[in-house]
Amino acid sequence: MSLLTEVETYVLSIVPSGPLKAEIAQRLEDVFAGKNTDLEALMEWLKTRPILSPLTKGILGFVFTLTVPSERGLQRRRFVQNALNGNGDPNNMDRAVKLYRKLKREITFHGAKEIALSYSAGALASCMGLIYNRMGAVTTESAFGLICATCEQIADSQHKSHRQMVTTTNPLIRHENRMVLASTTAKAMEQMAGSSEQAAEAMEVASQARQMVQAMRAIGTHPSSSTGLKNDLLENLQAYQKRMGVQMQRFK
């Protein structure tokens, strides 16, 4: 796995699933391939994206700044600086300075990542802030190691939270989660179907599923009524893809 592929993997792991994630993935691919060279426009686009947390925007802004060639005097962006200040906690800043001194002596991606993993997410964000604000310089590889360690910590906590929700025994939460997943799957089906004539059937199935979820929410249904809803949709999607000559494994 190349360094940039690894960075892209870690960064995308903290972005919520949805159309925006696909858009960000495309932007990262373009940046890493040297196709997008307008840092100013890229940062303006990032700043106005909905849904993303300030920290995720800060990390993405840091990645873009490290990767896209820019004028030396280009102004640093406030939304990135605010996100990478470790919540203004002086303890985070103290640890960030210690981490920075270690990273300065480290030139490899994996070495920097290993060092950074022993620090808290707040200290890691502050350390990124130091480098972003040009208060310290490290090799690009070390900076990428720092970014990936931060993403790993964030992804770990997100995974724990997700696992708690998935394994919850509360039937109401499980019911709502199944309906949300079914609705999201239906939305994805509509986007994938496009405008071809054969797409009408897939669009119809997706539309009916979304209407069903809306009705279930409006009238209130038994928690078990949503069981299998998402899987039924996925089976319909696969059948549609097969007819279109597309062979894909299950989205599970």
UniProtKB/Swiss-Prot annotation:
Biological process (GO), any one: viral budding from plasma membrane
Family: Belongs to the influenza viruses Matrix protein M1 family.
Coiled coil stretches, renumbered: none
Gene for this chain: M
Protein name in UniProt: Matrix protein 1
Pfam families: Flu_M1, Flu_M1_C
Annotated keywords: Host nucleus, Membrane, RNA-binding, Viral matrix protein, Virion
Gene Ontology annotations for the cellular component aspect, listed alphabetically: host cell nucleus; membrane; virion membrane
Motif (Nuclear localization signal): 101-105
Ranges where the record places region RNP-binding: 165-252
Membrane-binding as annotated region, ranges: 1-164
Function recorded in the entry: Plays critical roles in virus replication, from virus entry and uncoating to assembly and budding of the virus particle. M1 binding to ribonucleocapsids (RNPs) in nucleus seems to inhibit viral transcription. Interaction of viral NEP with M1-RNP is thought to promote nuclear export of the complex, which is targeted to the virion assembly site at the apical plasma membrane in polarized epithelial cells. Interactions with NA and HA may bring M1, a non-raft-associated protein, into lipid rafts. Forms a continuous shell on the inner side of the lipid bilayer in virion, where it binds the RNP.
UniProt subunit comment: Homodimer and homomultimer. Interacts with NEP. Binds ribonucleocapsid by both interacting with genomic RNA and NP protein. May interact with HA and NA. Cannot bind NP without genomic RNA.
Keyword Membrane appears in the UniProt entry: yes
Record-linked Gene3D superfamilies: 1.10.10.180, 1.20.91.10
GO molecular function, one term: RNA binding
Membrane topology: Peripheral membrane protein
Subcellular localization: Virion membrane; Host nucleus
Comment field (misc): Most abundant protein in virion. When expressed alone can form virus-like particles in transfected cells.
